[in-house]
Amino acid sequence: MATLHIEHPITDLSTWLGAFSRFSEARKSAGVNAERIQQPIDDPNYIVVQLDFDEAAAATAFKQFLETNVWSSPQASPGLAGSPRARVLESVTAR
């Protein structure tokens, strides 16, 4: 399993959630099988998203889609304030 971990400042939660919802089909088509949205308890203008994929390649491809088609356009990413930080993570096992 791989997780696309994304975090960034937002203008407000309602606007951001509306934009996030518009891309639900894109997430499904890309192979997202679970998602988590969280905020720091002390910062309502910051969001953390984790999207789970079966394969790292699918997570990497979706990261590239977001960078090229979503985050590069203010019209496609209302609610985004600042630059997102995104990384593809894989689970490790303690020995």
Task: Describe the residue ranges of each PLM region.
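An amphipathic, aromatic/His-enriched active-site/gating alpha helix that lines ligand/cofactor pockets
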Residues: 17-36, 52-86
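Short acidic/glycine-enriched loop/turn segments that link adjacent beta-strands
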Residues: 42-45
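Residues that line or immediately flank small-molecule/substrate-binding pockets and catalytic motifs
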Residues: 39
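Short, low-order "capping/linker" segments at domain edges
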Residues: 87-95
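Short structural boundary motif marking the start of a folded domain
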Residues: 1-4
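Residues that cap or initiate secondary-structure elements
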Residues: 12-14, 55-57, 92
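Short, surface-exposed ligand-recognition loops at beta-strand->loop->(often short) alpha-helix junctions
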Residues: 9-19
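Short hydrophobic/aromatic beta-strand micro-patches
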Residues: 7-9, 50-52
